[in-house]
């Protein structure tokens, strides 16, 4: 999937949380309805079979309950996408990334080959359809997630290039696949944030640590030999740069990928570097934009939502630009694009008890026109308003309501923008107020069963607030667009 990811280490976040967030985007010309749900251990099969690649994988015992964002319409696989398990481990998968012919020629992708004549079918590897479902229920730390997924990649291979994030309350790890069976992973330093458009991102890698103490780096077992045999290290000084070795520097990156990283880095570090003009240190087309940076101030969930909603506001590249030189308008792929399916921001709060530590912030449809809302992740079920998405358009659920608001607001942008700004702030404020209220109730409740009920009660209250404000905003945006219809006439009937 075409996506955008932000990772924030605990010392870089406003409250000591680890935070991982990703826009899940459909490919061009497609939209994928999503639902926010809980998958229970008893729902998991003993053997998993991929719909797309037909690979079959036995699943271990001891699965954990986890939240997920699967496709609302069945038929093309689960695509669990993002969630938190009962051990407070978060995972988001995947960020589609890039590679190069040197890598793909040395370790080809493991693609499904259908039966032909007397030849039986040959299953493919694992991919975005499968990864969260195969990994998240079976891990108890972010590092365990890297190791389990790495083992699956080495054994079964993959048919696509992907980046995957794992978190617990202490650590964030980012894994990138290399060819069909290889991978690297790096622990995100506590004091930085990471921005990831759709290209291989890790820009430094310590092989000595990966094959030694493994404190900050992990990789596939034969990576050293793989690099040497295929002459993949392009460095002059012996310091491996994975982007050069395994990634891409294509013209398409300069309109589709690097501008997104540039905008996010520029937002959180506006004074660290020069971002524009003839003397710029970095431009939207720079290939050497840092994978991670120490921010100039601590990062909030609202910052993450703003960046993941970006359409290059405040730059000449904004597709909604209405004044000045418009020659570069819409030149680059927006982060908040029309085909955002959902955004999930997973937050592990260290100042809260384990059972209420994980908060999952959710947004549906185009981020440029929506709002996000927090929910407790340690629950047995999710509110119907976010879980009952169907293939048919309906204002009874948050996904389709958000899609309708976005489509109408886009067509009435100047008139509807202030409604959207008020909507987003109102939902964020009310959502935070309800979480604060229920955090206090949970802290005062000695009974574990009652606390579990309170978490679901909180989510129900948050969803009710959200539904009311979303319906009100839909009404206002519909009015603005209706007022702009071409058959409008300024004179009323006598």
Feature-to-residue mapping (PLM):
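Short Pro/Gly-enriched beta-strand edge/turn motifs at strand-loop
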Residues: 61-65, 146, 322-330
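Short, conserved catalytic/metal-binding motifs centered on acidic residues
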Residues: 6, 145, 344
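Substrate-recognition/cap regions that form aromatic- and gly/pro-loop-enriched pockets
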Residues: 312-313, 317-444
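A contiguous strand-loop segment
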Residues: 2-128, 148-280
């Amino acid at each position: 999937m075409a996506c955008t990811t932000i990772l924030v280490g605990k010392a870089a976040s406003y409250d000591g949380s680890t935070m991982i967030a990703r826009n899940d985007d459909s490919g061009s010309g497609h939209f994928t309805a999503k639902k926010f749900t809980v998958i229970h251990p008893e729902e998991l099969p003993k053997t998993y079979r991929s719909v797309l690649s037909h690979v079959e994988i036995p699943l271990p015992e001891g699965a954990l309950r986890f939240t997920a964002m699967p496709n609302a319409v069945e038929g093309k696989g689960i695509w669990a996408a993002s969630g938190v398990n009962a051990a407070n481990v978060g995972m988001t998968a995947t960020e589609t990334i890039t590679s190069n012919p040197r890598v793909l020629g040395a370790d080809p992708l493991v693609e499904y080959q259908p039966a032909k004549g007397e030849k039986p079918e040959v299953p493919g590897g694992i991919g975005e359809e499968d990864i969260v479902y195969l990994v998240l229920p079976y891990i108890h730390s972010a590092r365990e997630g890297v190791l389990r997924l790495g083992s699956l990649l080495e054994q079964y291979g993959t048919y696509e290039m992907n980046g995957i994030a794992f978190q617990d309350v202490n650590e964030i790890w980012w894994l990138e696949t290399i060819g069909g069976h290889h991978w690297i992973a790096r622990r995100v330093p506590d004091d930085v944030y990471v921005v990831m458009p759709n290209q291989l991102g890790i820009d430094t890698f310590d092989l000595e640590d990966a094959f030694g103490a493994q404190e900050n780096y992990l990789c596939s077992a034969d990576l050293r030999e793989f690099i040497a045999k295929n002459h993949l290290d392009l460095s002059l000084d012996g310091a491996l740069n994975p982007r050069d070795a395994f990634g891409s520097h294509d013209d398409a990156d300069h309109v589709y990928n690097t501008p997104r990283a540039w905008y996010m880095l520029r937002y959180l570090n506006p004074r660290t570097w020069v971002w524009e003009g003839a003397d710029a240190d970095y431009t939207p087309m720079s290939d050497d934009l840092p994978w991670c940076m120490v921010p100039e101030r601590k990062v909030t969930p609202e910052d993450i939502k703003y960046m993941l909603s970006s359409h290059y506001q405040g730059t000449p590249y904004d597709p909604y630009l209405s004044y000045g030189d418009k020659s570069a308008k819409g030149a680059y792929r927006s982060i908040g694009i029309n085909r955002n399916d959902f955004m999930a921001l997973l937050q592990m709060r260290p100042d809260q008890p384990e059972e209420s530590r994980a908060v999952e912030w959710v947004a549906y449809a185009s981020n440029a026109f929506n709002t996000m809302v927090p929910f407790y992740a340690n629950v047995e079920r999710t509110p119907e308003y976010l879980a009952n998405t169907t293939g048919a358009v309906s204002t009874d659920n948050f996904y389709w309501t958000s899609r309708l608001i976005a489509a109408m607001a886009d067509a009435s942008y100047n008139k509807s923008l202030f409604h959207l700004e008020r909507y987003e702030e109102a939902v964020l404020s009310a959502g935070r107020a309800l979480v604060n209220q229920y955090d206090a109730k949970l802290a005062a409740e000695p009974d574990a069963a009652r606390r579990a009920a309170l978490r679901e009660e909180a989510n129900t209250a948050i969803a009710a607030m959200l539904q009311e404000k979303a319906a009100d905003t839909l009404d206002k945006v519909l009015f603005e667009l209706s007022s702009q219809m071409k058959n409008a006439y300024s004179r009323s009937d006598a």
